[in-house]
């Protein structure tokens, strides 16, 4: 089982799909990583040679993924909350941040209805 960026990649999936199990790597980035590493997109992760795994690790290390990315996102949200911006207040209250209507919708963000 290939382990890249602290994540065990699934063995039976194509490497492009397996790379998307890493937080911060989507489909387009996975394809770019495979192209830059010179690894075929159709190869299964169980069939990777140790050299291919090392090439992929080197390419993935160039991106901000997993813990570093999660930390950066949470620090960005914390900064918005600390400076008291509108977006920070919406985060603090658990409401939609990007201008969505909340009169009838946003049940996921607001939580379940309480009887009034």
Swiss-Prot record:
What is a GO molecular function of this protein? Answer: structural constituent of ribosome
The record's listing under Gene3D superfamilies reads: 1.10.8.50, 30s ribosomal protein s13, domain 2 (4.10.910.10)
- Specify the domain of life of the species encoding this protein: Bacteria
Region annotated Disordered sits at 91-116
Q: What GO cellular component is one of the record's annotations?
A: small ribosomal subunit
Is Membrane among the key words of this record? no
- Which keywords belong to this entry? Ribonucleoprotein, Ribosomal protein, RNA-binding, rRNA-binding, tRNA-binding
Question: Is this entry keyworded Ubl conjugation?
Answer: no
GO annotations under biological process?
Answer: translation
Q: Tell me the Pfam families matching this sequence.
A: Ribosomal_S13
Q: Where is the composition biased (Basic residues)?
A: 106-116
Q: Which family does it belong to?
A: Belongs to the universal ribosomal protein uS13 family.
Q: Which HAMAP family match?
A: Ribosomal_uS13
Q: What does this protein do?
A: Located at the top of the head of the 30S subunit, it contacts several helices of the 16S rRNA. In the 70S ribosome it contacts the 23S rRNA (bridge B1a) and protein L5 of the 50S subunit (bridge B1b), connecting the 2 subunits; these bridges are implicated in subunit movement. Contacts the tRNAs in the A and P-sites.
* UniProt subunit comment: Part of the 30S ribosomal subunit. Forms a loose heterodimer with protein S19. Forms two bridges to the 50S subunit in the 70S ribosome.
What name does the UniProt record give this protein? Small ribosomal subunit protein uS13
Q: Which gene encodes it?
A: rpsM
């Amino acid at each position: 089982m290939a382990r890249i960026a602290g994540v065990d990649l699934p063995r039976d999936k194509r490497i492009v799909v397996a790379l998307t199990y890493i937080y911060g790597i989507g489909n387009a980035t996975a394809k770019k990583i495979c192209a830059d590493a010179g690894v075929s997109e159709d190869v299964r992760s169980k069939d990777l040679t140790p050299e291919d795994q090392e090439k992929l690790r080197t390419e993935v290390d160039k991106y901000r993924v997993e813990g570093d990315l999660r930390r950066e996102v949470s620090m960005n949200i914390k900064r918005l909350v600390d400076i008291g911006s509108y977006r920070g207040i919406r985060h603090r209250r658990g409401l939609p941040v990007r201008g969505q209507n909340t009169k009838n919708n946003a049940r996921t963000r607001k939580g379940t209805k309480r009887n009034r």
